A protein has these predicted regions:
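Conserved N-terminal catalytic core of the sugar/cofactor nucleotidyltransferase
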Residues: 2-5, 13, 27-105, 109-116
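Histidine-centered beta-alpha loop that forms part of the nucleotide-sugar donor binding/catalytic region
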Residues: 8, 54, 133-134
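Short N-terminal binding/cap micro-motifs at the start of the first secondary-structure element
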Residues: 11-14, 139
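Residue-level signal for inorganic ion chemistry
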Residues: 34, 60, 92, 107, ...
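Catalytic-core segments of class I nucleotidyltransferases/pyrophosphorylases
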Residues: 100-102, 109, 115-122, 135-138, ...
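A short, conserved acidic/glycine-rich loop-to-beta-strand motif
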Residues: 124-134
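Phosphate-binding and adjacent anionic-ligand microenvironments
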Residues: 241, 246-324
Length: 324
């Protein structure tokens, strides 16, 4: 099966953490987000992958190569300037041809059952199927309103609290039929949520929304990045793929075998402490974060070359635990 991975982002809001790295190369507990996504695709059977690049494409090309070390066949499309999510995918028409295909963003951590999503799409004969996920802070995302059959009736882009009527947000993960891409013009910026989906609804093309189990987190802000890193340490990014090949081990060729990932033992306390620190989007995290609450201490910081995230949690009467 085929997948298009959108990996052109620069990650300006994460600049204090990533330096000049492309956004998909952000290290998540020692492993780039991009590596985790390629492993997720392989485990779900999406082994034919086209990656759209824009910002510093040579970094990702050198890192990923032809995809063989991940167990996938990898091709690239380089944009001289951003073309929007749908515009970038439209430029890959020679890749997807007449097949339904997956679209996934390179700036989120995810453990969805993507194979199950693909099967739901085919059963519904939808133009597009959207992976939905509940979010307690939905104001920065697009909300999706559905009928009882799961068909999308309306989109609410980044609402205020007065207009929040659901917690299901658009994750930017889609199964797309080629007929939907016929609505996307060539050679001009075009976005799925802002441009294509309203056209499809106006044309009475069915858009299916599927609430997903598992884990999903957009790492677009420093606050979300650190929260996601703690979730990974706590084991929340485990695969949720009942329809996929469960016997396939993780394939992360660039993971450091000398690093250990261990659960934080009192995660509820740590997360409450982090929340109370009120990390604001765009804050400077160059030197990481150090919090104290009674006898508890929590330190989160990039290592010297920003290739990993180091987390140290010290309990009042316990030996220090270090997770790399």
């Amino acid at each position: 099966m085929k997948a298009i991975l959108l990996a052109g982002g620069q990650g300006r809001r994460l600049r204090s953490i990533t330096g000049s790295l492309p956004k998909p190369m952000v290290p998540l507990v020692g492993v780039p987000v991009l590596d985790r996504l390629l492993d997720l695709l392989r485990r779900n059977g999406f082994t034919d992958v086209c990656m759209t690049l824009c910002y510093r494409p040579e970094v990702i090309q050198e890192h990923c190569g032809d995809g063989s070390s991940y167990g996938v066949h990898l091709k690239y499309r380089i944009e001289s300037e951003p073309r929007g999510t749908a515009g970038g995918v439209r430029a890959c028409s020679d890749f997807y041809g007449r097949e339904d295909f997956l679209v996934i963003s390179g700036d989120a951590a995810c453990s969805f059952d993507l194979l199950g999503l693909y099967r739901r799409h085919q059963q519904a004969d939808a133009a597009v199927t959207i992976a939905l996920y509940p979010n307690a802070e939905p104001l920065q995302y697009g909300l999706v309103l559905q009928d009882r059959q799961g068909l999308v009736q309306h989109f609410i882009e980044k609402p205020d609290w007065e207009h929040v009527v659901t917690d299901l947000v658009n994750t930017g993960i889609y199964i797309v039929s080629p007929r939907a891409m016929a609505y996307v013009p060539e050679d001009q910026p075009f976005d799925f949520a802002k441009d294509l989906f309203p056209l499809l609804l106006a044309a009475h093309e069915p858009i299916l929304g599927v609430p997903m189990d598992g884990y999903w987190c957009d790492i677009g802000t420093p606050r979300a990045y650190y929260r996601c890193s703690l979730d990974v340490l706590d084991g929340r990014l485990s695969p949720a793929q009942p329809d996929a090949s469960d016997d396939l081990p993780p394939q992360l060729p660039h993971a450091d075998p000398n690093r250990r990932t261990v659960p934080c033992r009192d995660r509820a306390h740590l997360m409450r402490t982090v929340s109370e620190a009120m990390m604001e989007a765009g804050a400077d995290f160059t030197d990481g974060l150090h919090l104290r609450d009674g006898g508890w201490e929590l330190s989160i910081r990039p290592d010297a070359n920003a290739s990993a995230l180091q987390v140290e949690a010290n309990a009042p009467d316990a030996a220090a635990e270090t997770a790399h």
